[in-house]
From Swiss-Prot:
Statement: the UniProt record of this protein carries the keyword Transcription regulation: no
Residue positions binding ATP: 40, 66-72, 95
Annotated binding of Mg(2+), by residue: 215, 218, 220
Domain of life: Bacteria
Residue spans crossing the bilayer: none
Record's protein name: Probable lipid kinase YegS
Any one GO CC term of the record: cytoplasm
UniProt keyword annotations, A-Z: ATP-binding, Cytoplasm, Kinase, Lipid biosynthesis, Lipid metabolism, Magnesium, Metal-binding, Nucleotide-binding, Phospholipid biosynthesis, Phospholipid metabolism, Transferase
Amino acid sequence: MANFPASLLILNGKSADNQPLREAITLLRDEGIQIHVRVTWEKGDAQRYVDEARRLGVETVIAGGGDGTINEVSTALILIRDGVAPALGLLPLGTANDFATSAGIPEALDKALKLAIAGNAMEIDMARVNDKTCFINMATGGFGTRITTETPEKLKAALGGVSYLIHGLMRMDTLTPDRCEIRGENFHWQGDALVIGIGNGRQAGGGQQLCPTALINDGLLQLRIFTGEELLPALFSTLTQSDDNPNIIDGASAWFDIHAPHEITFNLDGEPLSGQEFHIEVLPGALRCRLPPDCPLLR
């Protein structure tokens, strides 16, 4: 590789003993690439390491982990107000890696690492909920959220993204729809929602394409609602009739307001947020991310 400015890798602590990653970093260092590595231990570490990255003058901060790690690092980057923030690099090491997968990030660690360091930095959108909590990939509510948050860690570690589906099938008889009202630009719907997906990215829950037309640089959020009063019949219909399915409601808007008569929970890139009122808005061009030239999430 040619000479590139230094990067700082923020590595999820669960991947600290990843031997192939150590070898990939060593090879790049042998080529003269400067890579600082910091390992997270607790919440807030990503913010501290992003602050350190600025002091070191690196041009790229690489998020090494799953969607939650990418969320923490990207949120810390968009909070930078003075000067130019480092670009975000993606190194998928989590259970599902939904955002990185849909963005076309290579699965091979060495290729992903090279892209994170040397890829073109593109401006992409993020989203913010209730003027506070951000997500880069997707906010999911209803059946999918409860499954994602309740799936045991050991099952996720053993089976990866498939674990969400297995745990969901085990819990189907106890899950009911969420009644809510959703408004957006030229959009209004109310009823019983089995699953709600509001996507900057396209997939969640270990590869489920909830918002298949979403783009990360169009200034819009994509909405998909899976409706129905009875879970099993509605889910069967959704899986077998994807075109013109009455159980699927789609929308697109720069913002969505959600009201529920009871508390519901949204999963924001793995981080649960509960309440009855949600204002979700897009943040156009919020950060720069190093992506492949043929990234399917770019218009």
